Structures are given as structure tokens and as C-alpha cells.
Amino acid sequence: MAVAAAAMIGLPQAYLEGKEVKETSSLVTELCRHFYTQGWVSGTGGSITMKVHDASIPKPEQLIVMSPSGVQKERMQPEDMYILSANGSIISTPSPKPYPNKPPKCTDCAPLFMKAYEMRNAGAVIHSHGMESCLVTMLNPQAKEFRITHMEMIKGIQGHGYYDELVVPIIENTAYENELTDSLTKAIEAYPKATAVLVRNHGVYIWGDSWIHAKTQAECYHYLFDAAIKLHQLGLDAATPDHGPIRRTIHSQIKDSQYEREWPRRWIVLDIEGTTTPITFVTDVLFPYARENVGKHLNLTYHTAETQEDIKLLRAQVEEDLREGVTGAVPIPHADEGKEKVIAAMVSNVEAMIRADRKITALKELQGHIWRTGFECDELKAIVFEDVADALEKWHSSGIKVYIYSSGSRLAQKLLFGNTDYGDLRKYISGFFDTTIGNKKESRSYKEIKETLGVDDPAEIMFVTDVYQEAVAAKAAGLEAIISIRPGNAPLPENHGFKTVTSFSQI
């Protein structure tokens, strides 16, 4: 069977018996034994799969090694492994073993593993039945997500840092493993940043670019699940920055001269410019700093991966601008024309974009990297209105989760709130949204925020901004929109119909 199957996919039998496949099979065996000692694959449960790394074969076309089903994971041998083609077809089956061993069977997780390979270009996938991965889904039987923030091991999860909120989708268990395929697929689609999916009362699927990434993340996820369980036992909330007491129901009073009502507010989303921070700080301090230092920044960091990515993003934006006839856009030469020419064109485009106050991701990412240097060197200190720090602390202590939504990059937002004249305010903020989630003047962006937060009723989210068009978009998405009136803000249309505040103390 193995010879025929190998021939069908254009591989010689010798390859299936070669070094790469043998080493991968041995590694899967070794990891299964290790994870058995962790309690992740006991009682024949759980499973591991891994791509056969071969630099001569593109990753999507590499063979796959999968552990068998119903086998004592701590006693497995390399010859017990199944070998699959890149599309999931079995091309090598292990030989049967004498009684009391069961006939060989590929893991029931195979269809779910294939989804991680196909949809996330994974290099390895781990399915754990660790007790903490089961219990964490029971803390709130109605929850569709697991959330945790401000915990050290979050940094071990791809794309996350200490201040980020880690969100893992939870899907409902079924009687048979392969029946989870559709719900796992939907979860992977709905949570593009996630590298894991929890199955209620069952376990967790975790993937990574390689076996090292998958293993590292699995260890971090289990640590975080355990931390959340222990915090819950202490009556503390893992999803808030200071892990304060769990609050089951939160009610706040909104009062003004026109109405008074009780509103179960749990989420507040804040704009920055003209809402938490004076417009003049952005226009008179941040923008000039970026404009004056862009050339210096590009010269010093030109060969770094980060700056090369910034150049790539800006070049793509400029090409689009040139097609649309945007004023100030000039072509950015290819790298082989020399560093100096590339930087000169970059500077010219950045200056034009800043003058036009363009709200585009390519510019905002580069600005964030320039501002990072300014904050690190104490050349910049962020300014917030005097009522902001007290309000953030009050909302946080009340169990209300505060998020930021700004056209500035997430990095720039974190730098600003981490370096204010009132100290580091990030401890009061649960997360940050930027234009990668959508344009602030489009209602679908606010719908995406609602889905990301896992909120059923959008009216439970209050959005505060100084921009009328943003308030209109948020309201169209069902959010409670309030307009911030601050010194220097643009005038509002007459009869705009929105509640306004001049201070966060009025919220």
C-alpha cells in the first residue's frame, strides 16, 4: 500500500523510509511521551501531528506525520506513525501489533488537524486533553471565548505581548471528534489571530509554524489556562488588567438634563485625538516629530526586517496612490537602485501624507516605529486630558473593560498610554484597535469590534469620539455613541442628535 500510494504522489518509496520522515516520526514519539507526563495525552487521548520538514519541498506540499488513535501515547514507537500526503491522504500505515494491541487506526483528529494545516499553514498541531484546558471552559458555561490579559506567558503566544488581551474561541463538544470539523473551521475563520481553539469539556487544539512554536505555545496556553482557573478560585478576574474581583453584574448611571436610565455597560471604546488627548499634541508634537525624524529613522534601521516591511507597505500604498492620482505621491524606487534613492522617495511621500493627515495603515505603522524611538529616548511625553486617568481607573475598578480605537497603529497607541504625563495608563486598558479592523467612518468596523469582543448586544458598547462621522458609523452598527467636546475640536453639525460630554467625569 505504501509503495503504491507513494508512487501516486510522485515520491519514491525510499523517501518514505528516508531520514526526514524517520526523524519526524521519532520526534512525534518523543513529544507524545513528554506530553504524557504533563497529563495532556493520557488514557490514549490527545494527539500530535507534524509536517516533515524538507527545505527542498514547499511547506504546503510537505508530507505529514500523525500519531495513531487508541494507543498508549507513552509507549508509542516511530514505526507506529501514519504518513499522510499534503492533502491528507494516508500513504503509509503502521503494521498491526499482537494482542492486546488494537488494529492500527489513524487519529480521529485528522480532519481537524488538516484544517489547521490548510487554513493557517501550520507546521505542527497538538491536541491536548489537559485538565486545565477542560476546566477553563467550564468557568462560564455560556462563554464563547476564553480571555486573559496582563499575564507574563501571553508573550509566548504568536502576535501577543504582555499588555494584549489573549482571546481563544470556545466551541461545543460532540460525541465524535470528527464532528467538530465544521465548528473548528468557523472558529479559525472568525479568529484570524488565534493559534488555538478550545473544545468545551474536552480539550484544546493548538498549532504553530513549526513543532517548536506549537510546543512553546502549548506550554504557554496551559500555563494561562491554569492561571485563569486559580484566579477564578480566588474570586479574581483574569480578563481585566489588574485581575480585580470578579463582578457578575455591572450597572452604571448615565445622567443628563434630558434623561436618566440604568444601563448595563460593560465595554467602553475610546478614540484618542480630541477625546483622550488634545488635538494639538498630535498635530503640533507627534506629526512634526515623525516628519522631522523619518529620514534619520530610515537611515539607522534600513536593513532591519521591521523597516523593510514598512517600506514594502508604503510602496504598495504609493503605487495605489499613483494609479488614483493622489497629490504628492512619488514612485519609490526598487531596492537595487540604492538605499539613498529609496529613503529620499520615502521621506517625500511621508511628508505629503502627514500634510494631508492620511489615515492609512502604511503611514501609521511607520510613524509608530519613529515615535517609539522618541518615547524610549524621553524626547516625547504623551499628554492626556486631566479627567482621563481618573476615569480610566474608576471604570476599571468597576469592572468595565476599556478599549482604544484609533487610526494610529496599535504600537503607537500603546506608546502613548504607556508614557503619559499621568504615568503608565495601559494597566486600565484591555485592548487596542487600529485601522486593520476597518475605517473608523464605516459601520462595518464597529460590527467587527463587536464580534471581536464577543458582545451579543452592541448597545452594551459605548463609543466616545470627537468625530461626527465616526459617531454616525458606530450608531449605525448599534453602539451607544457619545461625542467628546474638547478644546480645539471641530464644530459639530446643528441638530446632530448625539449626547455630548466635555469631560469623562460626565460618563
Curated annotation (Swiss-Prot):
It comes from the Eukaryota. Its EC number is 4.2.1.109, 3.1.3.77. Binds 1 zinc ion per subunit. Binds 1 Mg(2+) ion per subunit. Gene3D superfamilies: 1.10.720.60, Class II aldolase/adducin N-terminal domain, HAD superfamily/HAD-like. Zn(2+) binds at residues 127, 129, 202. Pathway: Amino-acid biosynthesis; L-methionine biosynthesis via salvage pathway; L-methionine from S-methyl-5-thio-alpha-D-ribose 1-phosphate: step 2/6; Amino-acid biosynthesis; L-methionine biosynthesis via salvage pathway; L-methionine from S-methyl-5-thio-alpha-D-ribose 1-phosphate: step 3/6; Amino-acid biosynthesis; L-methionine biosynthesis via salvage pathway; L-methionine from S-methyl-5-thio-alpha-D-ribose 1-phosphate: step 4/6. Transmembrane segments: none annotated. The modification N-acetylalanine is found at residue 2. Signal peptide: none annotated. The active site is at 152 (proton donor/acceptor). Substrate 1 binds at residue 109. The keyword Amino-acid biosynthesis applies. Keywords: Acetylation, Amino-acid biosynthesis, Hydrolase, Lyase, Magnesium, Metal-binding, Methionine biosynthesis, Multifunctional enzyme, Zinc. One of its GO terms (molecular function) is magnesium ion binding. InterPro entries: Aldolase_II/adducin_N (IPR001303), Aldolase_II/adducin_N_sf (IPR036409), Enolase-ppase_E1 (IPR023943), HAD-like_sf (IPR036412), HAD-SF_hydro_IA (IPR006439), HAD_sf (IPR023214), MethylthioRu-1-P_deHdtase_MtnB (IPR017714), MtnB_viridiplantae (IPR027505). Residues 268-507 are annotated as: Enolase-phosphatase E1. One of its GO terms (cellular component) is chloroplast stroma. Its cofactor is Zn(2+); Mg(2+). It catalyses: 5-(methylsulfanyl)-D-ribulose 1-phosphate = 5-methylsulfanyl-2,3-dioxopentyl phosphate + H2O; 5-methylsulfanyl-2,3-dioxopentyl phosphate + H2O = 1,2-dihydroxy-5-(methylsulfanyl)pent-1-en-3-one + phosphate. Substrate 2 binds at residues 406-407, 440. HAMAP family: Salvage_MtnB_euk, Salvage_MtnBC. NCBIfam families: enolase-ppase (TIGR01691), HAD-SF-IA-v1 (TIGR01549), salvage_mtnB (TIGR03328). In the N-terminal section; belongs to the aldolase class II family. MtnB subfamily. This is Probable bifunctional methylthioribulose-1-phosphate dehydratase/enolase-phosphatase E1.
